[in-house]
Amino acid sequence: MKQIVGLVLILCCTQMVAQEVFPDGKAIPEWFRENKEVNVNALGKKYSITNYGVVNDSTVVQTKKIQEVIDLAAQNGGGVIVVPQGTFLSGSLFFKNNTHLYLEENAVLKGSDDISHFPVKMTRMEGQTLNYFMALVNADGLDGFTISGKGTLNGNGLRYWKSFWLRRSINPDCTNMEEMRPRIIYMSNCKNVQIEGIRIMDSPFWSTHFYKCSFLKLLNLRITSPASPVKAPSTDAVDLDVCNNCLLYTSPSPRD
């Protein structure tokens, strides 16, 4: 009996040890278990975009005004860019050191369906470094950047999808590189990033793309694209490109 109990204890200990390592045998760092929610109150001053001339209007593209709020926060040491309840239309936004994005409940940051509102810059796409349209939310070289809240990043992809399928009907071999369209989130050379709680929907192209990022946490996100009435082409939920130490986790009881 003692031998049986001893064998059970050994097996239990072995199982516990197995749970503490990756499949390649390397130890799992404690970082993967420390999944605390973003505390926006600890991230500095809050800059609600509607306090700086941005209006709740889903028909007016307000890229310039929203970017000015981001730049103002960066110039003053950083802070949290707050998108309040409402729908705000924008092209590419570029976040700076010590700035963060917070989407309140029922807040929607919506991408323009006009590709001209997304500048062409050197970026990464399908394994290549090339000039391509930037995303709705962009971050490069940031340490500690966060996106949090209960709001939505809406890529507003319908017009882009229709254009893709029209081109594909004319040229069945049409590729993504021939029918260019923006992503929702693109981050490069960033570390200690956490994106949590938000909804990401209707991306024109890849929903999120991370290049050369490390210590990246994507927690309790809801990422969706439709299959009908117009199928959303190549709207991958998450694309990890030359990244390391990444955690994608959804709790057993998502919001919806």
Residue ranges and their predicted role:
Residues 237-238:
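Core domains of intracellular innate-immunity/apoptotic signalosomes
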Residues 241:
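Glycine-rich phosphate/ribose-binding loops and adjacent secondary-structure elements
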Residues 2-6, 16-82, 87-100, 104-189, ...:
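Extracellular "leader-to-stem" segments immediately downstream of a signal peptide or signal-anchor
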Residues 249-256:
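Conserved small/polar residues in nucleotide/adenosyl-binding loops
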